[in-house]
Amino acid sequence: MVAWLVLLMVMIVGYDVMMRYLFHSGSVALQELEWHLFALIFLLGTPYTLKHDSHVRVDIFYKSQRVSDRQRAWIDLFGGLFLLVPFCLLIIISSIPFVTSSFIAGEGSPDPGGLPWRFLLKAVIPLGFSMLLLQGVADMLRCIFVLRQKKD
């Protein structure tokens, strides 16, 4: 799904640039849609990236042959438990009042010609971080499974 959002964003940006530079006609709504799509790509793509172990890390140490699977599991478990889980919980808990007030106000764009229903985009913040948290927990369970296996 996120790949389709990227394709859609590329097409919208291309159209917006063409309209602005060739026809001198810009659109606030299109520019806001680009920002909204980028936010969706980030918020929904991050859990997917974690699932497929594609996040940036210092591979010179982590992927070297000197680091065993058990050591990698310890590194991942530590990172998940002490970095990922607290960060996700902080974002989820602190974003709920932010999203709630946005829903109550029916928040839209403050710019003339901007997009309405900004509260819908803000609702994706706790959703995306909840998905990231769930994927992090799944990865930590996988690490525990690796650590519980008997050494060869």
What are these model-derived regions, one by one?
Residues 1-152:
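Alpha-helical transmembrane segments and membrane-interface helix-loop junctions
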